[in-house]
Amino acid sequence: MELIINLSYYHVADDVPETDSDIAVVIDVLRATTTISWALKNGADSIQVFSDLDLLKDTAKKWDGNKRLMLAERGGKTIDGFDLGNSPLSVTKETVQGKRLFMSTTNGTKSLKKVQNVEYLFAMSLPNRKAVAKRIISLNKKNVLILGSGWEGSYSLEDSLAAGALAYYIKENYNSEVNILNDELQASLALWNVWKNDILELSLIHISEPTRPY
């Protein structure tokens, strides 16, 4: 028997109330969860995220230097002393295959840590939205929390677009009722419905605005 799925979305980690969600989906399109998705696709063994850089370093040192990579970014820039930043272009198959990645970013890792204790946790970006949606449907769980990462505590257009894309795909493909629980997700779903055929155009308009580093 398929359960009713309840979907909610919050823009940033600080907005999330106490929750009994079965599933959490964290989105940081620019760029943590996009990088995580590509790294795993390219053969990374696993990825561990940290808010604290010193803890990241101490943990990474316990691993064979040939089988680990340290990734860290603050304010859109790679931090000195780390192997990589948070660009998806850097996590090539040749670079990450078979390695454990230790990662810290300005926004995405904060959201991942916020919901780390849920039963099922997904890192989603636009390219893997359908795969995440299919997996959520197959799990047949009731409460799904979608969490954006924003930019330094503020709203992110691209995260909300991705949240809307996820909700749209679940609604279109789930054989039972899907409840949209809050205005944040209703707005994100509307955003996706307007722009789903012109994602590139929206991205170019958004990135052309010099509001933050990419």
Question: What does each model-identified segment do?
Answer:
Residues 174-203:
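Flexible, glycine/charged-enriched surface loops at secondary-structure junctions
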Residues 127, 138, 155-169, 174:
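Glycine- and Gly-Pro-enriched alpha-helical subdomains that act as flexible
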Residues 13-14, 24-38:
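Short acidic, Gly/Ser-rich segments with clustered Asp/Glu that frequently serve as metal-coordination loops
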Residues 35-42, 59:
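Short active-site loop/helix that positions an aromatic residue
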Residues 206-214:
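Single conserved hydrophobic/aromatic residue that forms the stacking wall/gate
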